[in-house]
Amino acid sequence: MNRTRISLTAALLSLCLLLSGCMMPPAEGTVTSFSLEDIPAWSGEPYVAVDGNQPDFPEEDMTSVSFETYSELDTLGRCGVAYANVGQDLMPTEDRESISSVTPSGWINREYDGEYLYNRCHLIGFQLTGENANEENLITGTRYMNVDGMLPFENLVADYVK
């Protein structure tokens, strides 16, 4: 009887936890310009082009003035929108320091094949804005996503801006 009660309690708590995350409203300012059904199946590449690979920025953001904005964390501690117009004035002048003080939502410290499986990933790369241990700019991502998916694009932008 005790074993059944413990199992039922665990199942009920799991269901409550699942439903509380599913019932969160979308982050404010979230705009979707494509449908998830339009995203093709994984082809072996770490990224996919959306919207015909055409940017769609509001007219007021088409400026040479640098800026960066970060959403506040939601009630579950998740990052929201990070948005910047990167200029040389935002780029760091010092080396990146440790970001281990930030524990992004979903963080698990695990190794696979001698490498850490998960990385603290900057939404806007450190080399672009110099934001180091900003919890509003760090998410949990796989090493593959960070190194193969995000870093090549960060490097392209940094090379262009320099």
Identify the meaning behind each predicted range.
Residues M1-A11:
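Bacterial N-terminal signal peptides that target proteins for export
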Residues L17-G21:
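C-terminal motif of bacterial Sec signal peptides marking the signal peptidase cleavage site
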Residues P55-K162:
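Domain-level detector of nuclease and nuclease-like folds
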